[in-house]
Amino acid sequence: MASENVFDVAKKLGYWNGKEPFKFWKAYSGKNYSGQLKSFSTREHFILNALAPSLKLDYEAEELPISVKPDKQVSVTDVMALLRETYEGTPLDMTQNLKVTVKDRKTGKVDTIISPKANPWMRGDELNMLNGIKKGVVKSVRNIAVPQCAYSTVIQLRNWLPDAVGGVVWFSMDNPGQSPRVPVFCGITDFPAMYKICGNHRYRDDAALWHYRRANKLAAVRWGTARKVMEKNIRHFEEKGQRELPFVEAQYQSILQSKGEEAARAYLTDYTADFIGATILRWDEMANQYWIESRFGF
């Protein structure tokens, strides 16, 4: 969508000569947010390439297609995994050079591993310090999962089911690479109080965001160690949501038939609230454990 004078303004301001094919991105920006003369960034290239590797999309190209047809059917959990991406194990991995040698206490075997202190969400001052010690040891990359994220969604729509239960927003607060996703059905009529409060401008214990963020930030301090528990809990709630989804759909339909729409929607509302409560409790427990593990210092 654009205003009717989109071409005229581009000509008047010298952004487009009127002879070449008009490209909005080139006329009104000409570069991505990293200043590169292209229409896309690392994140777009990574996701499109992951979905359609057969296209062999070239990062050195000036532009990419706005969308691609995936090589195979994409599941909801596939999309969730993409939104957690930090390019680990690829040439874009920010932690790949942050290695230490460790010695096994029992065998005496020495190995080189990524430092437990390394994490893919380092602030600029950390990057500057590390690159000051050894130039180029860390290259700043815009990950798909970023710590400044307020929330992210994976929207699942099934037209063969009633709208109230066929539409599910898999919702996550804070960093998508560290937080769980909760199923928010289109038919719910209310949210838990903590989900109605914004915590982005100041710390609030009554805002759900900070119950996730507290554990997430503490985990990043020693990510190599803390991630084991956090990723296990992320998987737990992802698998729980997928496993229980058919049951919830059946229950909704049964209640709808026997008690009516209001009761059926109340069931969905309660289910979402219970799911949210379970994730908050688990992330609070993790944060407390991370504090204990940090009692001798970070």
Predicted segments, located by residue:
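C-terminus-biased signal that marks the final domain/tail of proteins
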Residues: 1-298
